[in-house]
Amino acid sequence: MTANAHRTALFAIAPLAMALFFVGGPACGQNQPKPAHDKTFWRAIAAHRYQVPANETPFALAQELSSYLGSPDPELRDDLSYSILAVWIIRQQRFSPEELVQLNEEWTANLRDGIGQSGTDSIFKRSFSALCLSSLAERELKAPFLGLLRYRKLLDATLEYLRDEKDVRGFDATKGWIHSTAHAADLLAALASSPWFTKPDQAAVLNAITQRLAMANEVFTYGEQDRLANVVAVTASRTDFDLNRFQSWLAEMDAADQEVWKDSPPKLPALQRFQNDSYMLRAVISQLLQRPSTPALLEVQKSVLKALKRR
């Protein structure tokens, strides 16, 4: 081929290449995922009252934020990702019911990601997915989107998570809040406010709280008992509250806790359980005093105070 022929061929190809570049054909990577935004981008959103930037869609940003829930970076995970998602879900209601359902499915699945591990960074995805699910459950109370079947699945998944989570760390000086027990409690408190929450559910949740406190293998020191007490207070405030079942649950807890004094010195697991239960019951009293008084709540207070006097 002569030099002129080479030039002719190149000139013939050039317009096509330029067209692909500007139109956004495969050569320019239009179908490739958009690059992740840096923290400066997310800080700007938080600083501007959580407004969605121009040329961005809330759900696409939510999917990116969701991928950061497992980050060991406390600013990215907590201050930015969780905080932005919570505002967009509850206060600003940026997402359609279909999008909320999709987030619910993703975050519920995350509760099982690495379950059984302890002391690893896998905890962040599980714990902060539970916290984000609590925002969805709060949104559900204001504008229902889950439906009964999804609600039942979420409640079951939450109880399983509280039962199976082995990593109960509350806080890390470098990586920030971990708080798996507190976040699961926040989710249960929102779910316990639902009209779909039944009397058998009340019993299941109370038993899950007892089990969590008994199996923690430490005395909680980052407010976990307060968050679990809130679940008890929410349950006790329901119009269909099963007072008899509550009193049976409390008596069973109290009897189990008295076992601690059978050994001298007390065995550590029994002592940890005793302390966790005692702190939680004191927090229940505090929570109930902040709520409008009802005959049922007064009975709960009397029963809890009676149990505390025996400690």
Protein language model features and the residues they cover:
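Bacterial N-terminal signal peptides that target proteins for export
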Residues: 2-15
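Bacterial N-terminal signal peptides
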Residues: 12-24
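Boundary at the C-terminal end of the N-terminal hydrophobic targeting segment
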Residues: 27-31
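Alpha-solenoid helical repeat scaffolds
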Residues: 64, 79-83, 128, 157, ...
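Eukaryote-skewed repeat-based solenoidal scaffolds used as protein-protein interaction platforms
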Residues: 103-112, 116-239
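A cross-kingdom marker for long, charged
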Residues: 235-236, 241, 253-311
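Intrinsic disorder/low-complexity flexible regions in very large eukaryotic scaffold/regulatory proteins
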Residues: 241-247
